[in-house]
Amino acid sequence: DLHSFPTRRSSDLGNSHALAAVAGLPARRARPGRAGLLEIDPAFEDALLGIKQASHLHVLYWLHQAPRQTLRRPTPHDGVLRGVFATRSPQRPNPIGMAVAQRLRREGARLLVSGLDCLDGTPLIDIKPYLPQADCVPGATLAWQPAPAPVPAPAP
């Protein structure tokens, strides 16, 4: 029974705000590259010391409006039914979302970022710096995911 799983407790760090969001859609799905705001609770502002040294951040959040009972979902690319642990679906037993967001600027306890994939008002769980040498796995694949289009070379 999914409802008998133990519940973990954590402190919300604050909330995310999708700037110019389309109602009901995560910011990235609504408009790629849209800016978002991470509003950190003032009690955690000291934890932002040094954040300006990171160009990109892992942002973890609680997908508070996502159903938690779903264990299998069809994937959007091919419609094949898969377990949620094999997908990036927000519908999962512990609806934890993650995005790699570009840090644009810090204003006190607020971070302006680009690349959030969550609804306006989504509770923040954690923020970590993106480490290129540790977080990028060359050659990693997911067999059912279409290969990304090649990045064109810059014009001379």
Regions found by a protein language model. Name each.
Residues 98-118, 149:
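Well-ordered alpha/beta subsegment
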Residues 116-146:
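Flexible glycine-rich active-site/ligand-binding loops centered on an Asp-His dyad
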Residues 31-72:
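Short, well-structured hydrophobic secondary-structure segments
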Residues 4, 91-100:
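Short coil-to-beta-strand transition motifs
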Residues 71-87:
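Short, compositionally biased
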Residues 1-7:
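Single conserved hydrophobic/aromatic residue that forms the stacking wall/gate
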Residues 143-156:
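Charged phosphate-binding loop/patch that engages nucleotide di/tri-phosphates or the phosphate backbone
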